[in-house]
């Protein structure tokens, strides 16, 4: 029984270790690089009407009312 117990413990340890390595690999693969994040941020800021100064005066007033009423 001692050899079987040792084998089971070793097998479970190896499986857990492999799952941890796989999870770390998947996490690393899904995280975008800093260059990608900068590109996404710049494109978002350029396309968003709040940041590219294309709001009409009425939209600015409405935004101001929204912010001041929420405080």
Curated annotation (Swiss-Prot):
Bilayer topology term: Single-pass membrane protein
Induction (record text): Expressed in the late phase of the viral replicative cycle.
Side of membrane Virion surface, spans: 22-70
InterPro entries: Chordopox_A13L (IPR009236)
UniProt keyword terms in alphabetical order: Late protein, Membrane, Transmembrane, Transmembrane helix, Virion
TM region positions: 1-21
Protein's cellular compartments: Virion membrane
Superkingdom per UniProt: Viruses
Entry GO CC: membrane; virion membrane
Similarity section: Belongs to the chordopoxvirinae A13 family.
Role played: Essential for the encapsidation of DNA into immature virions (IV) and the subsequent maturation of IV into mature virions (MV).
Protein name, per record: Virion membrane protein A13 homolog
């Amino acid at each position: 029984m001692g050899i079987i117990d040792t084998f089971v413990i070793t097998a479970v340890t190896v499986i857990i270790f492999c799952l941890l390595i796989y999870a770390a690999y998947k996490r690393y693969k899904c995280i975008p690089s800093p260059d990608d994040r900068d590109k996404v941020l710049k494109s978002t800021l350029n396309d968003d009407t709040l940041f590219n100064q294309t709001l009409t005066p009425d939209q600015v007033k409405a935004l101001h009312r929204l912010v001041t009423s929420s405080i």
